[in-house]
């Protein structure tokens, strides 16, 4: 896969390679201006390249645009917010 082309559909951001999803992050509305990041998947051959962080940042960008707060249900998303203090303002309290 030469170029990361992050695509979107309702509830997810994803990367496809030859028509197959090789990386995806899913989120769902929780009501009252809150979304949860539910799951992150990166195919084994793409792990360790920062793709999961890119996908979390896509959800963060979406949350900022839509004025939403985030609940990081997915353990990877929780880890991301642990590392990136500046984005914690988006966490639902």
Label for each model-derived stretch:
Residues 11, 42, 76-77:
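A generic "binding-loop/recognition-motif" signal
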Residues 29-37:
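A conserved beta-turn-beta hairpin within the catalytic core of GNAT-like acetyltransferases
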Residues 48-61:
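Conserved acetyl-CoA-binding loop-helix of GNAT-fold acetyltransferases
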Residues 11-22:
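Conserved beta-hairpin
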Residues 1-8:
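Conserved N-terminal entry element of GNAT/NAT acetyltransferase domains
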Residues 58, 62-93:
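C-terminal structural segments of small proteins and small subunits
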Residues 40-47:
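A short, internal acetyl-CoA/4′-phosphopantetheine-binding micro-motif in the GNAT/acyltransferase core
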């Amino acid at each position: 896969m030469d170029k990361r082309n992050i695509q979107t559909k309702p509830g997810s951001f994803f990367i496809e390679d030859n028509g197959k999803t090789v990386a995806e992050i899913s989120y769902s509305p929780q009501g009252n201006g809150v979304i949860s990041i539910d799951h992150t998947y990166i195919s084994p051959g793409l792990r360790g390249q920062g793709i999961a962080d890119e996908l979390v940042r896509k959800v963060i960008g979406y949350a900022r645009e839509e004025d939403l707060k985030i609940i990081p249900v997915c353990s990877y998303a929780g880890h991301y917010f642990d590392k990136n203090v500046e984005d914690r303002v988006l966490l639902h309290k």
